[in-house]
């Protein structure tokens, strides 16, 4: 599965802690992240991942391009709900694309943990079927 890890500035420590706690699960998948988030995760874990630009500089859109091609299977985007984000339209576009392509989108620590536990149990394997249907 291809998983994107994204976090707003005030949430970066939480996503690093999440990656550390679920490293054994995440290590079995192809990981992608926006710039700073990816750097922080790689510094704290032994996970390898593909890093895109920082979110406000286009990293969200790079991940969005993969979503538009139905090349992502899970998005974990720990958002800061209390701070206005200048790239909010990009975030809304990601959410919309995930809805179009039936890609799970976790926006907080609770939903991210549930998704990762479901991933471990094989409960997101249906994504492979959805991907194949869209390729046909």
UniProtKB/Swiss-Prot annotation:
Protein EC: 4.2.3.3
Keyword Lyase: yes
Reactions listed under catalytic activity: dihydroxyacetone phosphate = methylglyoxal + phosphate
Top-rank taxon: Bacteria
Keywords associated with the record: Lyase
Alphabetized GO MF terms: methylglyoxal synthase activity
GO biological process: methylglyoxal biosynthetic process
Function according to Swiss-Prot or TrEMBL: Catalyzes the formation of methylglyoxal from dihydroxyacetone phosphate.
HAMAP family (alphabetical): Methylglyoxal_synth
Family: Belongs to the methylglyoxal synthase family.
Protein name: Methylglyoxal synthase
Gene name of the record: mgsA
């Amino acid at each position: 599965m291809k998983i994107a890890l994204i976090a707003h500035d005030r949430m970066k420590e939480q996503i690093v802690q999440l990656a550390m706690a679920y490293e054994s699960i995440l290590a079995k998948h192809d990981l992608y992240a926006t710039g700073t988030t990816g750097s922080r995760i790689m510094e704290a874990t032994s996970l390898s991942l593909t890093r895109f630009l920082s979110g406000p500089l286009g990293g969200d859109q790079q991940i969005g391009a993969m979503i538009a091609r139905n090349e992502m299977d899970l998005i974990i985007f720990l958002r800061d709900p209390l701070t206005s984000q200048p790239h909010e339209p990009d975030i809304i576009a990601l959410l919309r694309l995930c809805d179009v392509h039936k890609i799970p989108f976790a926006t907080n620590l609770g939903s991210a943990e549930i998704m990762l536990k479901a991933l471990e149990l094989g409960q997101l394997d249906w994504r492979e079927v959805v991907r194949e249907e869209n390729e046909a």
